[in-house]
Structure formats: structure tokens, C-alpha cells
Design a protein with these regions (language model features):
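Short coil/turn helix-boundary motifs
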Residues: 8-9, 30, 44, 125
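Amphipathic alpha-helical segments used for helix-helix packing
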Residues: 27-46, 96
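C-terminal peripheral helix-coil segments that are non-catalytic and often amphipathic
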Residues: 21-25, 60-72, 90, 97, ...
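Amphipathic alpha-helical packing segments from all-alpha helical-bundle domains
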Residues: 26-29, 46-72, 81-85, 112
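Short, hydrophobic secondary-structure boundary micro-motifs
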Residues: 35-37, 50, 78, 99
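Hydrophobic alpha-helical connector segments
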Residues: 2-29, 83-87, 111
Length: 125
């Protein structure tokens, strides 16, 4: 769960960084599963709705962290739903990147790239 993986971090930027790193590692290790998950998100069948609800629940957990970070003055003001969806969207970005890089994908290099662009963009200076 997101709460368990982020509990040890004292600030909200670090919580988001942990989420991003976990997402990259999951895509790296379970590429086929993530491909299925993303493909099942679209559609109107019962299985699609279930997948959508689970994704929305996950995004909701990220949104809560973003909201709390904004309230504590650690994260820039913004649309929490959009920010949380953007962080979730890094799963798709990672999958595309992995397809292009193949076996050469360096998890930590990609993580630092996302940290420098996405996460640091949310940081209150």
C-alpha cells in the first residue's frame, strides 16, 4: 500500500519520490502486467470498471499526499487531481521509455530524471 511505502518519510516531496521510484521498479519488473493493466483501463465492461476503480483509488492516495503537502507548504499550489494523475502517468512514460531502451534501462537514472523534472517542479522553493 502507498501508506506503508511512504510512512517512513517525514516530508511530502520524499513521499512522492518514493512513489515514483516504486512505480519505475514495478514497470521494470512487471512490464507485461502493467501493459495489461493499462489496456484494461479503457472500456465499459465490468473488468474495465474494476480496473478503473482500482486506478482511481491509487491516484486518490497520491492526491491525498499532494493535498497534505500543499497544506504543509511543501508542494506548490495546484490541482491535486491533475498532479496525482501526472504522477500516475509516469507509469506509462516509464513503459514507453523501457520499450525504447530495452534491457538498457537504468532504473536509478530514470528516477533521477523524473526527480529533476517532475518532482522538483512541485517543490516550494
Amino acid at each position: 500500500s502507498v501508506d506503508i511505502k511512504t510512512a517512513k518519510f517525514n516530508n511530502y516531496i520524499d513521499k512522492l519520490k518514493a512513489i515514483v521510484l516504486i512505480q519505475i521498479k514495478i514497470v521494470d519488473k512487471y512490464e507485461d502486467l502493467i501493459t495489461i493493466l493499462l489496456s484494461q483501463f479503457w472500456g465499459t465492461e465490468q473488468r474495465n470498471k474494476k480496473c478503473q476503480n482500482l486506478v482511481y483509488e491509487y491516484i486518490g492516495q497520491i492526491e491525498k499526499i499532494v493535498q497534505e503537502g500543499i497544506e504543509k507548504g511543501e508542494i506548490k499550489e495546484g490541482d491535486t487531481r491533475a498532479i496525482a494523475s501526472e504522477i500516475y502517468g509516469l507509469i506509462c512514460s516509464t513503459l514507453v521509455y523501457k520499450k525504447r531502451e530495452g534491457e538498457n534501462m537504468d532504473v536509478m537514472r530514470l528516477y533521477h530524471e523524473y526527480e529533476n523534472t517532475v518532482i522538483n517542479g512541485l517543490r516550494v522553493k
